[in-house]
Amino acid sequence: MQSQKIRIRLKAFDYRLIDKSALEIVETAKRTGAVVKGPVPLPTRIERFDVLRSPHVNKTSRDQFEIRTHLRLMDIMDPTDKTVDALMKLDLPAGVDVEIKL
């Protein structure tokens, strides 16, 4: 008999939001009797952009911007019906992208 597993992947630009959301998910799952593995921090994806400061000349003068995408991964082993219902009702911040695989 194969056990069920819910894999949750969180993605956000702000690490404080993603850590707070991961903590809420872990507490909710443990309160309903499920076993949680994680949250596992995945490598942060850094996108860098170089933009010319001047609209006409001075190509050597540039501004550099970056966007950091933080990722967390967690597995919920043997979830009960109460666990799934509690996770569906959970209200997470708007800046966190949640991806769930069964």
Swiss-Prot record:
Annotated GO CC locations: ribonucleoprotein complex; ribosome
Transmembrane segments: none
Keyword annotations of the record: Ribonucleoprotein, Ribosomal protein
Gene Ontology biological process terms from the UniProt entry: translation
GO molecular function annotation: structural constituent of ribosome; tRNA binding
Entry similarity comment: Belongs to the universal ribosomal protein uS10 family.
Subunit note: Part of the 30S ribosomal subunit.
Record function comment: Involved in the binding of tRNA to the ribosomes.
Protein name: Small ribosomal subunit protein uS10
Organism this protein belongs to: Nitrosospira multiformis (strain ATCC 25196 / NCIMB 11849 / C 71)
